[in-house]
UniProtKB/Swiss-Prot annotation:
Family annotation (PROSITE patterns): RBFA
Protein name, entry field: Ribosome-binding factor A
Pfam families associated with the record: RBFA
Organism the protein comes from: Erwinia tasmaniensis (strain DSM 17950 / CFBP 7177 / CIP 109463 / NCPPB 4357 / Et1/99)
InterPro entries xref list: KH_dom-like_a/b, RbfA, RbfA_dom_sf, Ribosome-bd_factorA_CS
Subunit note: Monomer. Binds 30S ribosomal subunits, but not 50S ribosomal subunits or 70S ribosomes.
An example Gene Ontology biological process: maturation of SSU-rRNA
């Protein structure tokens, strides 16, 4: 039976924290003019590869997102070097960066639900909002 919270999960959490610190403090690439957030890291079972999921602040522009991912890909070797100094791992995973649009999609879905609820309340009218108030005991 596999461990519920094994080594790959622990390494992935630590990598997420360390990569976020490195991106904030060490990477000075002008292509990363926007703030980068590490939303998750998936590490292979042998700890040789890691998929790093990132989001960008002000990520409305598709070209800026692609440029940011390209900059992160170009800096991945340097990031691995810094990770090797910060973490005690025999093998520092090879990093591949991916854009994580789940936050954007979550916000979009939340706005849709809010709009539907608002439209539903407008259709019902003020008299039907609280049916309990009209009842006398």
């Amino acid at each position: 039976m596999a461990k519920e919270f094994g080594r790959p999960q622990r390494v992935s959490q630590e990598l997420q924290k360390e990569i976020a610190i490195i991106l904030q403090r060490e990477i000075k690439d002008p292509r990363l003019g926007m703030m980068v957030t590490v939303s998750g890291v998936d590490v292979s079972r042998d700890l040789a590869y890691a998929k790093v999921f990132v989001t960008f602040l002000n990520d409305k522009d598709e070209a800026a997102i692609k440029g940011g991912l390209r900059a992160l890909g170009d800096a991945s070797g340097y990031i691995r070097t810094l990770l090797g100094k910060a973490m005690r791992l025999r093998i520092v995973p090879e990093l591949t960066f991916f854009y994580d649009n789940s936050l954007v999609e979550g916000m979009r879905m939340s706005n849709l639900v809010t709009n539907v609820v608002r439209n539903d309340e407008e259709r019902r009218g003020p008299a039907e909002e609280n049916p309990e108030e009209g009842k006398a005991e």
